[in-house]
Amino acid sequence: MSSERVLNYAPAFKSFLDTSFFQELSRLKLDVLKLDSTCQPLTVNLDLHNIPKSADQVPLFLTNRSFEKQNNKRTNEVPLQGSIFNFNVLDEFKNLDKQLFLHQRALECWEDGIKDINKCVSFVIISFADLKKYRFYYWLGVPCFQRPSSTVLHVRPEPSLKGLFSKCQKWFDVNYSKWVCILDADDEIVNYDKCIIRKTKVLAIRDTSTMENVPSALTKNFLSVLQYDVPDLIDFKLLIIRQNEGSFALNATFASSDPQSSSSNPDMKVSGWERNVQGKLAPRVVDLSSLLDPLKIADQSVDLNLKLMKWRILPDLNLDIIKNTKVLLLGAGTLGCYVSRALIAWGVRKITFVDNGTVSYSNPVRQALYNFEDCGKPKAELAAASLKRIFPLMDATGVKLSIPMIGHKLVNEEAQHKDFDRLRALIKEHDIIFLLVDSRESRWLPSLLSNIENKTVINAALGFDSYLVMRHGNRDEQSSKQLGCYFCHDVVAPTDSLTDRTLDQMCTVTRPGVAMMASSLAVELMTSLLQTKYSGSETTVLGDIPHQIRGFLHNFSILKLETPAYEHCPACSPKVIEAFTDLGWEFVKKALEHPLYLEEISGLSVMKQEVEQLGNDVFEWEDDESDEIA
């Protein structure tokens, strides 16, 4: 009896979770799972041939590919199916009854095992992902169960059977998805069959332990299923097969026969939670904030709050169409600064500033992208650089350019022609154009060019205690009537409004909060409009899409208006579009120097003559009537 001993077991695996595993878990949580905390499948391929000599168990490596349904395995690797339960709240993770949870997973393995003994092996991970701090709490469990009657009380070492071990190793290499095999009456290795093993009483198990003469705890699962299949089995030969050296054989004895052989829900002892690095039965915590690329963290963090909108509030919100929109900001002043900050908060990645001014000493307190040290430097380039400091992955560009203005005579035709060409090229390159410049006449040429290129225009303009935010209508609109642009209410062509102005007229004198209100509404109007392009309908998950928003701070009121395009509009009427198409820069040059030329082309001059004639006719009629009465 001195050679008899109680059979002990080693832990089944030692887990190694790669950073890519947590990155993929983060992506799935944000983009796919959201509030879904149900079981998600995992797949691992075990390499039983290349186990480090210092390891006591087979490493269980989990990477981003572990989430793939078709996880391509290499030669000699053993596929293992598992699952992960990612909780929404840290307290749910902490308060989970871990033993009950593992017992439930063990019952699932048991039910699979009595159908196919090779299916009684699995693993499970419980986790919580703190996506703001990049801290991940997790605990690996490998359900190992043992029925009281299947306890192996005494084992007796069997002399080395190298030839048999070699045959088993080769069989497992070919049958890579199998965990057990048996010997038949002819001493041939065959698939597990309870009728055969009842007679031969030889069971071979693929092992994941490297400890000398100590099998992994997974052995308990196979022995429990074996005794369920052969309830009267007491003595048998157990072969522990390792792909490298270390295989051994035992003459084993069950504690007793199985009185519960017909029970599908047996009394079982369950273990399998992995110990942490301190050797305690407790979860592990991984802080990836110091390991990941800061730029990668910034990129994911920028999108975090936006993606959380889709979890519960706006599941149909299309964030990609916003992120991929290229935005051109004409004006890098107060409006341009606030609009750009709202755009990057919505996830826009491509912004181009156009401005020809420099930062004055009065600007930094009202224009959020500039500091005192920036005074005297070009606005456009500084605004772009400031956005990149806020978010280094931002594709921000600054272009110093003077927009040719109607009513302002040409000073340097060659330079202004180049500015015109550059402006038109910029409008072609971008998807949405924001008009955020100071003067009315500087909005005319961008409005015309955007209409020519069928670009979406968002216009924002400020008064002292009022603001206007509007979207321009396009020629390709599906509706029967085209919406008006910024100039559709004009009865005269824009003229020079900058010359001979006093200081209070030259500076933008507004209540400080007006610019913030107009800027935020302009960006929100853009995001709502983009959702209609995605859905193809007038309704949007973000609500209404007004044409014009006029706000008045003196009584804190807001009006939503809609006006059609004006047939004599100096910026978007068909005659103006046709003239520009035919003449190009020559048309623009004439309009810049002679605003009345634009009135003639658009038909405003004829309209004014008709109105004047109508007025004369009315006065003549009144005179005739007065004569008759007299």
UniProtKB/Swiss-Prot annotation:
Molecular function terms, GO-annotated: Atg12 activating enzyme activity; Atg8 activating enzyme activity
Location of the protein in the cell: Cytoplasm; Preautophagosomal structure
GO CC annotation terms, alphabetical: phagophore assembly site
InterPro entries the UniProt entry points to: Atg7 (IPR006285), Atg7_N (IPR032197), Atg7_N_1 (IPR042522), Atg7_N_2 (IPR042523), ThiF/MoeB/HesA (IPR045886), ThiF_NAD_FAD-bd (IPR000594), Ubiquitin-activating_enz (IPR035985)
Record's keyword terms, sorted: Autophagy, Cytoplasm, Protein transport, Transport, Ubl conjugation pathway
Pfam families: ATG7_N (PF16420), ThiF (PF00899)
Protein transport as UniProt keyword: yes
Catalytic-site annotation from UniProt: 507 (glycyl thioester intermediate)
Entry-linked SUPFAM superfamilies: Activating enzymes of the ubiquitin-like proteins
Role according to the record: E1-like activating enzyme involved in the 2 ubiquitin-like systems required for cytoplasm to vacuole transport (Cvt) and autophagy. Activates ATG12 for its conjugation with ATG5 and ATG8 for its conjugation with phosphatidylethanolamine. Both systems are needed for the ATG8 association to Cvt vesicles and autophagosomes membranes. Autophagy is essential for maintenance of amino acid levels and protein synthesis under nitrogen starvation.
Recorded domain comment: The C-terminal 40 residues are required for homodimerization, as well as the interactions with ATG3, ATG8 and ATG12; and the C-terminal 17 residues are required for the ATG8 lipidation. The GxGxxG motif is important for the function, possibly through binding with ATP.
Protein name: Ubiquitin-like modifier-activating enzyme ATG7
Organism: Saccharomyces cerevisiae (strain YJM789) (Baker's yeast)
Originating gene: ATG7
